[in-house]
Amino acid sequence: MKIKQKLVGKTELKVDILGLGCAPLGGNFVDLTYENGAKIIKTALQAGMSYFDTAAWYGFGRSERLVGDCLRHKKYVLSSTAGRILKPGAVQNPLDFGMIDPIPFNVMYDYYYDGIMLS
C-alpha cells in the first residue's frame, strides 16, 4: 500500500499524510511491552508508512529508544518535540506523569537555543 505524501513547505522533503504517533510506545497511559511496540512499528512499515512521531516525553525516552531500534537502516521521516532534555535519574512517581514503565530518566525543560539544539 502506498500512502499519499505531501511536500513540506518549500522544501523537497515529502512526508506521508498519515503517520504513527508513538506516545503509547513509551508507555504513556498504556502498559505496552517492547516486543508489542516493535510489532506495531513493523506493521506500520509493512503497510507502507514512513512517517513517525516520537518525543523524549514519551516514557522519558522509552519511545525514542524503541523507534530508533526499529527504524535503524530504514528510510523514514521523524518528527519530535524540542526543548525537553533527558537527564539520568528516575522520577519517584511515574504514574503522576501517566508513565506505566518509563526508562530511568527525568525530563528537564530548556527552551533556550542550547536546550533546543540539545533536544
Where are these regions (language model features)?
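N-terminal binding-site loop/beta-alpha segment at the start of enzyme catalytic domains
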Residues: M1-S80, R84-L86
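Glycine/proline-rich, positively charged
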Residues: V91-S119
